[in-house]
C-alpha cells in the first residue's frame, strides 16, 4: 500500500512533456521510467546532488546537464514531437528548442537501456542524505 501511495505522489508531479519522457523510456527499455527511475540514486527524480552512484544514475546526471543547456523553452513543461519504430526514437520538430528537449530525453532513454544491467535495487529510493559528495561539473 505504501508503494502505491509513493507512486501516486510521483505521478502528481508529472506534467507536460515529462509524461512523454515516461512513454519514451517505456518504448526504449520496456520499463516504466516513473517506477524504475522516478527516485533512484542521487540524480534520478526531483533534484540532484553529490556523485552519481552507478551508470544508471549517471544517465540521470547527464540528462540533468542536458536540460541545463536548453535555452528558450521549459524542458519540464514544453511538448515535443517524436516518433518511434520498434525501439528507435526519432525526434522531429521545426522548433529547435523543443527538439533539443527531445534529444535530451532520447539520449537518457538509450542510456537507461544500455545500462539496465547496472541497476541496483539498493539505490531505489536512495536517501538524499547519502548524496553528500561534491558534485562534478556537467
UniProtKB/Swiss-Prot annotation:
Disulfide bonds join 42-131, 44-60, 59-111, 65-138, 66-104, 73-97, 91-102. GO terms for biological process: arachidonate secretion; lipid catabolic process; negative regulation of T cell proliferation; phospholipid metabolic process. It holds the Pfam family Phospholip_A2_1. Keywords: Calcium, Disulfide bond, Hydrolase, Lipid degradation, Lipid metabolism, Metal-binding, Secreted, Signal. Homodimer. The keyword rRNA-binding does not apply. One of its GO terms (molecular function) is calcium ion binding. This is Acidic phospholipase A2 6.
Amino acid at each position: 500500500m505504501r508503494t502505491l501511495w509513493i507512486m501516486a505522489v510521483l505521478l502528481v508531479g508529472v506534467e507536460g512533456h515529462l509524461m512523454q519522457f515516461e512513454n519514451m523510456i517505456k518504448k526504449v527499455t520496456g520499463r516504466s521510467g516513473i517506477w524504475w527511475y522516478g527516485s533512484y540514486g542521487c540524480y534520478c527524480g526531483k533534484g540532484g546532488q553529490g556523485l552519481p552512484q552507478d551508470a544508471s544514475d549517471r544517465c540521470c546526471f547527464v540528462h540533468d546537464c542536458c536540460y541545463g543547456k536548453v535555452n528558450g523553452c521549459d524542458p519540464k513543461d514544453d511538448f515535443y514531437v517524436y516518433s518511434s519504430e520498434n525501439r528507435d526514437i526519432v525526434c522531429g520538430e521545426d522548433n529547435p528548442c523543443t527538439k533539443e528537449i527531445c534529444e535530451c530525453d532520447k539520449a537518457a532513454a538509450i542510456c537507461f537501456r544500455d545500462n539496465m544491467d547496472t541497476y541496483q535495487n539498493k539505490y531505489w529510493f536512495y536517501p538524499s542524505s547519502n548524496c553528500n559528495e561534491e558534485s562534478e561539473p556537467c
